Amino acid sequence: MSNHECNREEHSWQELKADALADDFCQGITHYICDKVYKPLGVAERLLQHPEERLTASAVIYSRARQEVWMVGDCQALIGGKLYENGKPYEQEIAEKRVDLIKEGMLPAEARRQIEPLLVEAMLSGQNKTYTVIDGFPIYREGVKVVSVSSSETVSASSEIVLASDGYAFLKPTLAESEEALANQIANDPQNISSFIATKGLVEGNKSFDDRTYIRFLP
């Protein structure tokens, strides 16, 4: 598979084995999106030039066979109480630009519109080149974080693992604590310009500023 082209061969996502490597997952999910979405729609060539239009996702996966956590894209994990993150490298700078605009008096909706060209530019120059995302094109492997659970000094037999999306501003050991921290963030800093800096804040009609997924288990 080329470093720049959508895969042209059929691939069965169901063939991924229990002892698969993180690279196997990355290749498998990329092939699946290309085969099942882009190729049937005839959009692969256009999306090659327009990464801002691609289907995009992140994933954080626990491999029981390999005792590893794979962080593919913008996600987070607590392993033995230690926080691991894998954010986009450009987001902090753009988020701070949005904060400055709002503090100067600009309405949050307009501040978001002002930074959107910067977000698109970052996608054009960096998506699966300087940071990792699942988008149906070859995944930037250097941006995939693999955490060995078995060799981690902080993990014991009774240690829990938490995997979550980036929708939790402050990831905690339990769902209740994480939801409480998020509720406090929304109540005290709904536009994410102070205690937590982000490229977007709470939009009217929404319950939070981003999607959220949370799972906690014993390895």
What label would you give each PLM region?
Residues 1-219:
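PP2C/PPM-type serine/threonine phosphatase catalytic domain
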